[in-house]
């Protein structure tokens, strides 16, 4: 994970800023984490990121950059930092297509208070700096997600959306999130690595539905699937079309009624908001498509169960192989060797479509980098005497997986065992909770942290994220954590979410245990307030590392819960190892009763 020299890029960007009378611009960096926001002035550069990436950012950013650690006391937010730089009439520029309308409004207000100006620049200056180095946009074909996996036809999904538009008295809805477009039309793509989506927009009104996509990406079976019910328009036509459509529908609307508006997701871009006519003509809301997508139907839930059984078998085969290579064969393997072997094993299983994210194969101190990505030639050799953390997942035609297991192949330290067991206890506590309908992931987060907190320990990431069905491995709007958004959406039957507490000591080791769980209705002796009560069903089928468990910290009830889980893991995955004695013996050992 080498530092990236950004001096030339920054110099080129600052030259473009000067030509366009822009004093401050967002964003460019040499940072590869999935969550970061960068701001460049004529003499400064700052990157803001959350606790998952502090360690990674410190390793990757060169001396040109100031790192703003989100959530740390006395560290300004990136908005505050930007507004401070704008003091005295400075102009802050941004490509409006890469910032949400809501974020743009908030930042514009802060900048205005400091006497500055927030300005949309329709050409992306970062792209101009990137120029010929920028990879070509993918041209892979779109595929149909058959109803045997999706259950519900796209016509029915569009009808449901129109009912929501009618309730809200809206002129139409612009679908701007790629996974929402894919889900709505029962289509999948491969334009974004690991995410089966394709570059697209969609516009649905009470009488029409239009898909904006490069038509060359649509083979005949996709066109037949869509039929004559859907209009296909070029991807680049979206902004011009919605401007014209918005004007036409507003002019045709009844002037005696309350003025109807276009509906957009609260994650839609400022550029889309502007194209529709601005705040006066747009109502931002949590996406009704995203809400529907997050509630899986029974076919999708069964697909998630089945793909996690296959994926669990792949992980057990990999962990058995890795232990044998390191301990018995004394092999020298680096972190990428491990990740490559795991992918090779996964590929053998039915309906495998690819990985769902870069495999985090990390040994020792690298395991403390929460979203670590090993690179060949730069990564570490796997040390059998150190913690090994593997966070990985796959895309299958019937579902998406994401599992983290932390292992030790020799003799862990007392602290490693204690930390692992505290994390495991938190993982189980969350999975076993029962809660009334209407409870949010924000309210449940502390359950996973309680045993760490009791020791004065914690972790700097959320406890859970939603997961798609052969879609994005990180899916909103639900999640479990302390983010404000997780306090706004209740967990519902059919949601699939991760349960992944952890603990990390920079420069030493990292621990994370992640199971995928599904929200279901549960029986309780009473139903206070006449509300249904909900709980979780685990679908991950991979053993915990018994070598890292401090049995003295577990209650008898917790041991019973683990034993029942391991019995289920063995019963559901052992059939894959009838001709694989090595993995079968490993699985028997790891799932033996505590």
Swiss-Prot record:
Question: Pfam families recorded for this chain?
Answer: Creatinase_N, Creatinase_N_2, Peptidase_M24, Peptidase_M24_C
For this record, an example GO cellular component is: cytoplasm
Q: Which PROSITE patterns match?
A: PROLINE_PEPTIDASE (PS00491)
Q: So where does Mn(2+) 2 get bound?
A: 391, 402, 514
Domain of life (superkingdom): Eukaryota
The GO molecular function terms of this record are: metal ion binding; metalloaminopeptidase activity
SUPFAM superfamilies under this entry? Creatinase/aminopeptidase, Creatinase/prolidase N-terminal domain
What the record notes about the co-factor is: Binds 2 manganese ions per subunit.
Provide the function of this protein. Answer: Catalyzes the removal of a penultimate prolyl residue from the N-termini of peptides.
Q: Which PANTHER family match?
A: XAA-PRO AMINOPEPTIDASE 1
Name-wise, this protein is: Probable Xaa-Pro aminopeptidase P
Native organism: Pyrenophora tritici-repentis (strain Pt-1C-BFP) (Wheat tan spot fungus)
Q: What gene is this protein a product of? A: ampp
